[in-house]
């Protein structure tokens, strides 16, 4: 796939000279974030109460209570500025954990369907209970390992997938791209991406029918923690060889394998 390889080389070469300079409006600029305006006051209140409970339950660290909005809720809602959830679209939240970014996005975009996937039943029980409290009819919680889920009926059925804290980019690519329909996008919020990791992700994407499309500033990052979103695109159908069996993507990431053979 020469087009995919050219794209990977172009992107990583541009990034290797240093991350681009942006002026980004952060969620802490001014008294309130623009992302909160996508919610009604009642929805914002319910979300804040839900994630205060998530802190108490240990799904978020104790220090997060004071920065729920700027580090978590605004951060989740701001993804819609990069890729707006459209009515009837299917979004997958990979390794959903405490439902971030999926639950806040589902509140703000009730015509879009969100599937929250996690291997830990306790977290998913909380996500389901919270979705019920928020009166969300557009949320489904799936208890599964992504390696198995990506080989089932949901394969290549999603328009967009998000992965907030799933692992290194090559691992995220292998677990996420098989779930996307051709033309879909995988959004991966990060801190400042490492050039080597981006190169490995680009190599992994070549094998998975995708490419690393762009690295864009995360407009909702707090001012003291500038972040980016890595965007991977699904170009052609993924080979049935992927994802590999449970645990293998994390132990032997695709991009690292290819990189070591150079």
Set out the residue ranges of the language-model regions:
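Class I SAM-dependent transferase core
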Residues: 3-92, 122-139
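Conserved SAM/SAH cofactor-binding pocket of Class I
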Residues: 77-165, 173-176
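Short strand-turn motif at the edge of the Rossmann-like AdoMet-binding core
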Residues: 119, 166, 189-193, 217
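Short alpha-helix immediately C-terminal to the canonical SAM-binding loop
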Residues: 123-125, 194, 198
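Short "lid" loop at the C-terminus of a central beta-strand within the Rossmann-like core
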Residues: 147, 191-195, 220
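Short glycine-/small-residue-rich Rossmann-like dinucleotide-binding loops
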Residues: 165-166, 236
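Helix-to-beta-strand junctions that scaffold the AdoMet/dcAdoMet cofactor pocket
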Residues: 180-182
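SAM/dcSAM-binding transferase cores
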Residues: 199-262
């Amino acid at each position: 796939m020469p087009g995919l390889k050219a794209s990977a080389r172009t992107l990583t070469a541009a990034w290797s000279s240093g991350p681009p300079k942006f002026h980004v409006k952060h969620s802490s600029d001014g008294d309130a974030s623009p992302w909160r305006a996508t919610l009604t006051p009642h929805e914002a209140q319910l979300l804040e109460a839900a994630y205060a409970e998530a802190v108490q339950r240990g799904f978020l660290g104790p220090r997060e209570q004071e920065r729920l909005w700027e580090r978590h809720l605004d951060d989740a809602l701001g993804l819609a500025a990069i890729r707006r959830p459209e009515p009837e679209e299917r979004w997958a939240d990979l390794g959903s954990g405490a439902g971030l970014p999926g639950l806040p996005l589902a509140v703000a975009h009730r015509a879009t369907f969100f599937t929250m996937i996690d291997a830990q039943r306790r977290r998913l029980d909380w996500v389901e209970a919270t979705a019920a409290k928020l009166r969300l009819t557009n949320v489904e919680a799936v208890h599964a390992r992504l390696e198995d889920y990506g080989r089932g009926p949901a394969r290549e059925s999603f328009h967009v997938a998000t992965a907030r804290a799933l692992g290194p980019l090559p691992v995220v690519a292998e677990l996420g791209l098989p779930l996307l329909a051709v033309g879909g996008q995988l959004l991966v919020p990060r801190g400042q991406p490492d050039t080597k990791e981006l190169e490995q992700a680009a190599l992994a994407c070549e094998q998975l029918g995708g490419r690393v499309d762009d690295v864009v500033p995360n407009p909702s990052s707090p001012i003291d923690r500038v972040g980016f979103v890595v965007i991977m695109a699904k170009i052609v159908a993924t080979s049935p060889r992927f994802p590999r069996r449970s645990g293998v993507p994390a132990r032997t990431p695709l991009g690292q394998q290819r990189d070591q053979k150079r």
